[in-house]
Amino acid sequence: AVHAIADLAKQPVPDVVNDVYHVNDLTFGPKYFIPKPVDPRLITEVSAAVAKAAMESGVARTPIKDWEKYKQELRQLLGQETKLTRKLHDTARLHPQRVVFAEGGNPTMLKAAVQAKNEGICEPILLGNPDRLNRVASRLKLDLSNIEIVDMRADNEQGRRAKFAKHLAEKRAREGYSFEEAYDKMYERNYFGMSMVEQGDADAFITGLYTKYSNTIKVAKDVIGIRDEYKTFGTMHILNTQKGVYYIADTLINRHPDEDVLTDIAKLSAGTVKFFNEEPVMAMLSYSNFGTDAIGSPIKVKKAVAEMQKEFPDLAIDGEMQVNYALNKDLRDEKYPFSRLKGKDVNTLVFPNLSSANGAYKLLQGLNPEAEIIGPIQMGLNKPIHFTDSESSVQDIVNITAVAVIDAYVEKIKNQK
């Protein structure tokens, strides 16, 4: 147990500890040489060490054969890890991919990349100046010895900048791109990093801590592009609540979608829910219920529902409806017995615009800070490009990295067929 505690003190400190003590980047040293009482790792690591000692001394009667499973069960009992998170991480560990982290010099992203590497989730590639990254890593007591660092502005990357620029200029020639303009853009982390994925030098890309979403969205459209069968792409957040898991879209991309864009969002949402091995039961939301208000947004939602039901007659989807009717099966069945969702628990909520979707998930997050939220999960781009935001924690980024890894693996399998 003593050795386990000593080892923990030298490892990167979880965000929850920094938050509780109102400090940034707590590291081993004169002011921190034993883990803080709130450190969630104490239960799993010290308990495992005590159990091992008990086995070695002959005190324990029941041997533990799978120590990782034992730690996972402890984390689940303590609420540190849900079945959803564990399933994502376990799947990613089976098929680790090369993931580019755009803001390699950011302490949060750097810690997330190292954690994802240590957990076997991915092979990280950090973008940034190597000297700066190593200084930050040294301050945080992080080991970057087996992690690739790419400086997109360095002289030795001139060849790749030219290669990526040529591809982008040819791809967007009818949209005003010249080679010179494309080459200049390759000094930017998002253009270079996404081009690495586009050209096969990496499998997935994580960005968003430094960049406005609007700028990142434009780069993604330019470099990666939207899948041919869609007019747009979108994002989804997964909320793991006491009532169950809910999938919410579109939380990031489309501000004022028309009925065609809403239809695309619904299609993408259904596919994404199936990606997580769930059967989608979808409610398309508005302030109106099944035609009670025939003005404004309810009309476009109603048209999108009609298109979805026509194209996918076996899909459980209906609307337009208010969110309370979507979430209350008994209320919905009593008031609207004709609904295609009769007797079903809704798990997928498609909102009529960005303000309502984004506000809804952030409201739930604010009311229940302990709730597990995974996202934003990108839907509809040609490659696995995924986003974070300036408020993302280390665990948030690790979770979205696991999603990106699975996304990349599934994409490879599809391309092999």
Where are the regions that the model predicts?
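Short amphipathic alpha-helical segments
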Residues: 45, 49, 359-362
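Adenosine-phosphate binding glycine-rich loop
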Residues: 2-47, 54-57, 390-392, 400, ...
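Anion-binding alpha/beta catalytic cores of soluble intermediary-metabolism enzymes, centered on
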Residues: 58-65, 70-343, 347-417
